Amino acid sequence: MDKECHIYVFLLTFLKLYVLVMDMRDIFQSVKAASRKLAIVADATRNAVLETLADKIEAKGDVLLDANSRDLARMDRKSALYDRLQLNKGRLMDIARSIREVASLPSPLGRILMERTLANGLVLRKVSVPFGVIGVVYEARPNVTFDVFSLCLKSGNACVLKGGSDAEESNKAAMSLIHEALKENGVDATVAEMLPSTHEATSMMLNAVGFVDVCIPRGGRKLIDFVRETAQVPVIETGAGVVSTYFDSKGDVEKGRRIVENAKTRRVSVCNALDCLIVDSNRLADVPSLCSPLAGHNVRIYADDKAFAILENNYPTELLCHATVDSYGTEFMDYAMALKIVDGVDEAIEHIAEYGSCHSESIVTEDKDTARYFQQRVDAACVYWNAPTSFTDGGQFGLGAEIGISTQKLGPRGPMGLEEMTTYKWLVDGNGQVRP
């Protein structure tokens, strides 16, 4: 009887997996077919879809908030992900405004990137075109559903989305509004699809060669590592940010205080938030002043021995801890950071090279030569001088919304706006020429 039971369970599991595989294949085929139609949809029509979607978010905000409340009810309020998951009326208005901003941007398609006439009379044009189908894997951030769709649609790309299970209800409600907006403007609704929030669905997307043209993971280091190690489709790495700010021997304390506070506390759950403050040993006496604004935000500091000694009587005891090796490579995504004392800019650069993630780094100094030295030698997508890393954002860079912050070197790097979501093809015009 036990053997028969095991066989039954095995067959049932196999059947469920088979059904999932067939369903996913149907989705990928439909989206791929729809992507070819979307590539030739007029920009005015794409903009109309986005305007309709923004209107729906404002008009049906209660539907989104109700779905979001069901997701929030399953999550611990103390979790660092709670803030990322939470929607409210203000955030919905921001989402609608961001979608309208995307609609107002120039189309990134059909731009002539280069044009030349060869000696044989052939006319070459390098023209921007969509990727085709973009797959995006992300965690508990329902706003990403709207961000990704609006950018994909505006850039002529279809999209397959795989959100985290924590935001399942919110994502379903968001995709329902997206499909309504597409249908009302005569655009095939299958240009955007939400996959089930299962590990199997993620694996299928990452291996959908021939259907998904590029995959973009948005989340923490574990998610990005999993996608990079598992995917057979091309991947653009985004998201994970172990971010440092170096306070140089010639740094201005007041600037440093403001920059450190803003970079660390403006929004702790985003990838551009400060994770490690590095201070020149010649400015050790200024560490309490640099850190004092953080106490009001209950920021826990993991300090090395030198920093701990000077903060011991100048920072709340319950918020001060001894750093370990692991402290420096941690993306905290919380009210916490590491603190390291170094002997000069070169040691700061070495520390960043060892523990950073090539995302965003900053130097606070009044010495221009030191600033340029730091900017040239630090390997990161964005390197700041006397400004907080919180500015690493597509909107702040004037790119409109972004699909993520790319930390790789091949392909897009830094905030990925509309232009970074296109590729190109060569158009070659001739008049009967043949190659000798």
Question: Model segments located where?
Answer:
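ALDH superfamily catalytic-core signature
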Residues: 23, 140, 147-158, 184, ...
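Rossmann-like NAD(P) dinucleotide-binding subdomain of oxidoreductase/dehydrogenase enzymes
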Residues: 104, 113-254
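Short, well-ordered beta-strand elements within core beta-sheets of diverse protein domains
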Residues: 34-40, 277-279, 334-343, 358-363
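Hydrophobic alpha-helical signal peptides and transmembrane signal-/tail-anchor segments
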Residues: 8-17
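C-terminal core of ALDH-fold dehydrogenases
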Residues: 48, 289, 345, 349-435
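N-terminal Rossmann-like NAD(P)+-binding subdomain of aldehyde/semialdehyde dehydrogenases
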Residues: 18-124
